[in-house]
Each structure stands twice: as C-alpha cells, then as structure tokens.
C-alpha cells in the first residue's frame, strides 16, 4: 500500500488593533456597537468616494513582518480583488496581489523537542468584509442580515509555505503566531470573536514525491481544536480516497463542528478568477529604510527570546518559562513582582522560583476560575500586593494553604493581605506551647495512625500533620507541627 505524506499550509487573517478602519475614519469597534452604526459612504461602497490608507495598519503589518523575519518591500501597492458575495460592499475587495508589504520569512515551532522551521510566503494588507447573520423566520425559512460595521476593518493575511506535515504542527504554528501577534500588540487575536481566523490548505502525496497533490481549502474553523480536528478528518478522507483510486478534487470545504466532518462548498478558485488589477484610487507605497528601522526600534522582546532569558537569567525550568511567557502581560506581572521582592533572607533562585510558582499556580487558577485576564487581576491584586503576601508566608505569619485562600479574597474584595488576615483571624500559629495541646489531642484521637508509625510506617506523619491543620483551621505552622508530632511519638 502506498505511503502518503500530508502537506499543510495556512492562511491566517489577523484583524489589526487600530482605532479607525483601513480606508476611512469609521471606528473599528464593531463587536459592541449596534449594527450598521460605524459606517460611512467609503465603507458602504458608495460611488464617487475615495479611500485613504490607514498608516497605523501599514506600520502594524511591517512590525509583524519584522517579528517573523520577513523581507520588507521598499515598494508596495494595493489591488482590487473582484468577486461577488453579499458581504462585499463595493463588489470588490481592496487587497494586495503581486507586491505585498512583506515577503519571505519564517517561524520556528517546537514539536516534541525538535525544531521545525515553517516558511512564511508573504504578509499582505487588505480590508475585512461585512458580517452576515443567518436567521430563520417564523415559518422556518432562512434569511440573512448584514452588519456593515465590520466592513473595511484592517485585515492582515499571513500566508505560510506548505511546510507543515501534521495537524499538530498546524496547531502549534497557530498558537505561536497568535502569541506573537499579542506580544506585538497589533491584534487581540481572538479566534472566538473572529479577530484571528484561519483557512487551511491540505493535500497528500506519495512519500518522497516532490509534486504537490490536489489542494483542498478548509474553512469555518473557529478554534485551535477545530483546526486540528478538521485537518485530521481531511487527512484521513483524502488518504482513503487515494487508496480507493478516487480522484481528489481541488475544492473548498467547510468544517462542520457539530458533525466533525468537512463538506464540499465550491470548486477552488484560482488567482485569475479574481481579476486582480491595481487599485486606481490609492497611490503606491514607498517604504524607506528609515521608516522600517523606526518600526524595528518599537519591537518588544518576543516570546521566544523572553523565555530564553527567563531560563538563563532566572534559573527557571523550560516548562515554567513557557507558561510565564505565553502571555506578555503575565510575563510583565511576574517581573513586576520580582522587582518588588527582597531576597535578602533566602537564596535568590529559591525566591524567584517561589514567585514563579505563585504566578503560574494560584494566580493563574484564580484567573481561570473567574474568566479574567491578568489585566483584570492586576486591578485587584497589584504586583506589590502579591509580593507583600509572599513576604508574610516567608516570615511565617501565614502558611501557604491559608495564603492561597487570602489571595482569593484579595482578588474578590480588592483588600490587602494584612487586612484580610487580621479580619478573619488567619495568622499562623507558630507558638509551640499553643500547638502542643493540639498535637496531643490529634495523637489521642488517632491511635491507629500512632500504632502504624511505631511499626515503621513513618509516612503516616503526613496524615497526622493534616489532622493538626484541620484542628487549627489551617493556622498551624506545618513545619513546627511536624516537629512536635515526631517528638511526641518518639517519646512514646
């Protein structure tokens, strides 16, 4: 049986985070606005109007190209892409065809410890289309409504080379690309609200063959999971067809998430079907070296570089560094806590590790439970506030378990740690004389555990410490509790 290789390339559409649209001054805030309120004659496609280029969108595209190692064009232009669809207000889309802003680039992804370099073919700038809302009337007859607020939102298309060989590589590529876009601040890059959209081109070929097979474009994927599942399904479908001697058609297929399958939508278009020609109402762009270097100077530290710095400079594991740098804001928060910290009483590497554990542990857990991001968390728990809580833990004022509960209260109330601890009486009990009586009661209440300890099952001490924590309502110093229990057990 013939062995096949899967070939995948991705076209990622990224809505740019500008205040105004690509070719007019209308607001880009289309998600929270009433339908068809952020419109004007330009984005409505009225005859006789002239578009103007959004400079910020051009800069964001160049910045993205620099972050992905792309060649930046010194000359670029816009073109008309002609096709007929209800969401296209002018009857054509202003896009870029043969002279995009950014040329060849690349992005490295990590697959099971091996680095795979995925080529970037180009990055071009265009305008988004309006949004169709499909509804049904009282008789069940379908109809569609059109919201033109989204029309002409700046849209950047990042086209990869067909360098991915598995659905997992495609997913990893998308996840890393989204992280980079967010680090740059050029887009919110949320798949769920459509600001980060992906079309996938997938084909198969016999292993070792240099020729590409018939390309199938897959659309309607609105999550990383959907991209993975759609490509996995399509990979199996195409291989089955090839094994059965059936011809694979070049077509566009849509992913049906509820049925976990792709369905044919139309035959795949070729470039000449769109009848591209230069946009006559917009001047070409001349991009100087000085402008490019000025944009390069604005580039933030990118996630891969920051992760390596965290590993080398903060002695963190690759796992912890990856979690902390997955979000620029989370990494900023971590470093802000470190800047507030005083590691005079403990080794610096141990202190840094403790801060990292709290940020990737309790802090992230609270955010996930609340459905909040780090910006919302910071409004309630500043880096200085978290640092102060960790100082209280280090000084033995509260134990770690109690501190986690205090942190939850800090987030829900906005109060500082000291206020919450005092109000709820949560200060850790470190006075041996106070803990001795609790230890004696625990031993008296658990004769079976005492007998097991005396028989050499020393791990039972953990259970007894837990009972002391329960008796003290979480306030006992666990280290002192363990010492007292061991002493009492050894003395018989």
Curated annotation (Swiss-Prot):
InterPro entries referenced in this protein's UniProt entry, alphabetically: Asn/Gln-tRNA_amidoTrfase_suB/E (IPR017959), Asn/Gln-tRNA_Trfase_suB/E_cat (IPR006075), Asn/Gln_amidotransferase (IPR018027), Asn/Gln_tRNA_amidoTrase-B-like (IPR003789), GatB (IPR004413), GatB_C_1 (IPR042114), GatB_Yqey_C_2 (IPR023168), Gln-tRNA_amidoTrfase_suB_CS (IPR017958)
Annotated family: Belongs to the GatB/GatE family. GatB subfamily.
E.C. number(s) listed in UniProt: 6.3.5.-
Any Pfam family the entry gives: GatB_N
Keywords assigned: ATP-binding, Ligase, Nucleotide-binding, Protein biosynthesis
GO MF term set: asparaginyl-tRNA synthase (glutamine-hydrolyzing) activity; ATP binding; glutaminyl-tRNA synthase (glutamine-hydrolyzing) activity
Gene Ontology biological process: glutaminyl-tRNAGln biosynthesis via transamidation; translation
Gene this chain is encoded by: gatB
Keyword S-adenosyl-L-methionine: no
Described function: Allows the formation of correctly charged Asn-tRNA(Asn) or Gln-tRNA(Gln) through the transamidation of misacylated Asp-tRNA(Asn) or Glu-tRNA(Gln) in organisms which lack either or both of asparaginyl-tRNA or glutaminyl-tRNA synthetases. The reaction takes place in the presence of glutamine and ATP through an activated phospho-Asp-tRNA(Asn) or phospho-Glu-tRNA(Gln).
Reactions this protein catalyses: L-glutamyl-tRNA(Gln) + L-glutamine + ATP + H2O = L-glutaminyl-tRNA(Gln) + L-glutamate + ADP + phosphate + H(+); L-aspartyl-tRNA(Asn) + L-glutamine + ATP + H2O = L-asparaginyl-tRNA(Asn) + L-glutamate + ADP + phosphate + 2 H(+)
Subunit structure, interactors included: Heterotrimer of A, B and C subunits.
DNA damage in keyword set: no
Protein name: Aspartyl/glutamyl-tRNA(Asn/Gln) amidotransferase subunit B
